[in-house]
Amino acid sequence: MSLEVRGIEVWRGRGRTLGPMDLTLEPGEVLAVVGPNGAGKSTLLSAMSGELRCSTGEVLLDGTPLLQWKPRERAMRLGVLPQESSLGFGFTALEVALLGRSPHSSRAEGSADLAAAVAALDATDTRHLASRSYLTLSGGERQRVQLSRVLAQLSEPLASGHRYLLLDEPTASLDLAHQHLVLEAAARFAQAGGAVLAVLHDLNLAARYAHRMAVLAEGRVVELGAPAQVLSQELVARVFGLRVQVVEWPGSPGPLVIPEGRAPLTP
């Protein structure tokens, strides 16, 4: 059981923006997807979520092609936090979190839905915002409330199959403390048997929280493995154009990347 991409390619016009690519997201892991701007990270996430149709290949959710799942059944298994979430109505933060319970409730929300939404707000440090209008929140607060919605959506273990959480730059608008809080919530989701794919730009956050890292460049996976195996001075210089030191740090679960400056261009 996994969320798997097999031989996918995405073409736009005459240009290929992603692939060919094979990648598997396993239950119990946090998989960080890193790479420079334009490498195809968000395109990959869109393909894995079903938002973007692949030109070739397929995406399998627990062994079944993603597009063959009924929307409600798929939503109970697969949750997505996009880079930006627009909402034009003055819902409270609690009401936004409750939106994630829609696949589980055919009628009005019950006590179990409310409990799941409140627990999700607790996980993202937004419970104190529960009665606030979403439209009055800061960008970082909105992002955390939207994560609460997705956590509430995936809060219930399934009788069969697994739960998959796809996060597109979940730390982009957050302060330092909340960056770690959000990734700690993702790690707990994985520890509970879920699977997390997170698109990240911060290599140190990726190294700290991810079990595996997929490094993308020009629409392809160029390295895949544990952070300690993947991150090297040579790789960061080649893929990101940056000179760094990669060191072990006492107490850190992954290596530490220390920037030194832009790497010289290589032919």
From Swiss-Prot:
<dbReference type="GO" id="GO:0005524">
    <property type="term" value="F:ATP binding"/>
</dbReference>
<feature type="domain" description="ABC transporter">
    <location>
        <begin position="3"/>
        <end position="243"/>
    </location>
</feature>
<keyword id="KW-1278">Translocase</keyword>
<keyword id="KW-0472">Membrane</keyword>
<protein>
    <recommendedName>
        <fullName>Hemin import ATP-binding protein HmuV</fullName>
        <ecNumber>7.6.2.-</ecNumber>
    </recommendedName>
</protein>
<dbReference type="InterPro" id="IPR003439">
    <property type="entry name" value="ABC_transporter-like_ATP-bd"/>
</dbReference>
<feature type="binding site">
    <location>
        <begin position="35"/>
        <end position="42"/>
    </location>
    <ligand>
        <name>ATP</name>
    </ligand>
</feature>
<dbReference type="Pfam" id="PF00005">
    <property type="entry name" value="ABC_tran"/>
</dbReference>
<keyword id="KW-0813">Transport</keyword>
<keyword id="KW-0067">ATP-binding</keyword>
<dbReference type="InterPro" id="IPR017871">
    <property type="entry name" value="ABC_transporter-like_CS"/>
</dbReference>
<dbReference type="GO" id="GO:0005886">
    <property type="term" value="C:plasma membrane"/>
</dbReference>
<keyword id="KW-0547">Nucleotide-binding</keyword>
<keyword id="KW-1003">Cell membrane</keyword>
<keyword id="KW-0997">Cell inner membrane</keyword>
<comment type="subunit">
    <text>The complex is composed of two ATP-binding proteins (HmuV), two transmembrane proteins (HmuU) and a solute-binding protein (HmuT).</text>
</comment>
<dbReference type="InterPro" id="IPR003593">
    <property type="entry name" value="AAA+_ATPase"/>
</dbReference>
<dbReference type="GO" id="GO:0016887">
    <property type="term" value="F:ATP hydrolysis activity"/>
</dbReference>
<comment type="function">
    <text>Part of the ABC transporter complex HmuTUV involved in hemin import. Responsible for energy coupling to the transport system.</text>
</comment>
<dbReference type="InterPro" id="IPR027417">
    <property type="entry name" value="P-loop_NTPase"/>
</dbReference>
<comment type="similarity">
    <text>Belongs to the ABC transporter superfamily. Heme (hemin) importer (TC 3.A.1.14.5) family.</text>
</comment>
